[in-house]
From Swiss-Prot:
Catalytic activity: chloramphenicol + acetyl-CoA = chloramphenicol 3-acetate + CoA
Gene responsible for this protein: cat
Family: Belongs to the chloramphenicol acetyltransferase family.
Protein name: Chloramphenicol acetyltransferase
GO-annotated molecular function: chloramphenicol O-acetyltransferase activity
One Pfam short name: CAT
Example GO biological process: response to antibiotic
Provenance organism: Staphylococcus aureus
Length: 215
């Protein structure tokens, strides 16, 4: 996948990038997403919620260059043409998880089938990263289906150059005849401001609301 170099000296975000990158400022935001119609539609069609949420997340990420901006293995700043999800899968027997990546696809059915194939092949492997090699253009996604939460934060102290978003999903719950699911978004301020966090949340909710258009 193509990695497009950003020339920092000519970048309109240069001042902000240098300031927050040197400070190593990251932040997280958690928002309850209304999945009432989404969950009902997914159930009727016979799909699983987790991969359907992953698909919706990747639609937002791959639509917006800001969420694909990072530093590659050659320590170059730039953005990928496309990112793929690297998601956790829990093993009930070992009480551990594996991280599996699946190729992104704009077509939901194609992505879902690829997900199911990868899951079948790798979910029982007792490795943290069973599907190798892992491409650079992946984004971490995980789900904690046992609890709903109002806040969630990750700290990456040993990788100061990781700029991509990290998404964590919680347990869905019912309130006032609506079904919600918490979604935590971890961002690096060097590339993403509060506006971009709001952009992600709003576009994600919009895709969830329009599930009938893509499922």
């Amino acid at each position: 996948m193509t990695f497009n170099i950003i020339k920092l000296e000519n970048w309109d975000r240069k001042e902000y990038f240098e300031h927050y990158f040197n400070q190593q400022t990251t932040y997280s935001i958690t928002k309850e997403i209304d999945i009432t119609l989404f969950k009902d539609m997914i159930k009727k069609k016979g799909y699983e919620i987790y991969p359907s949420l992953i698909y919706a997340i990747m639609e937002v990420v791959n639509k917006n260059k800001v969420f694909r901006t990072g530093i590659n293995s050659e320590n170059k700043l730039g953005y990928w043409d496309k990112l793929n999800p690297l998601y956790t899968v829990f093993n009930k027997q070992t009480e551990k998880f594996t991280n599996i990546w699946t190729e992104s696809d704009n077509n939901f059915t194609s992505f879902y089938n690829n997900y199911k194939n990868d899951l079948f092949e790798y979910k029982d492997k007792e490795e943290m990263f069973p599907k190798k090699p892992i491409p650079e253009n992946t984004i971490p996604i995980s789900m904690i289906p046992w609890i709903d939460f109002s806040s969630f934060n990750l700290n990456i102290g040993n990788n100061s150059s990781f700029l991509l978003p990290i998404i964590t999903i919680g347990k869905f719950y019912s309130e006032n005849n609506k079904i919600y699911i918490p979604v935590a978004l971890q961002l690096h301020h060097a590339v993403c401001d509060g506006y971009h966090a709001s952009l992600f949340i709003n576009e994600f909710q919009d895709i969830i609301n329009k599930v009938d258009d893509w499922i």
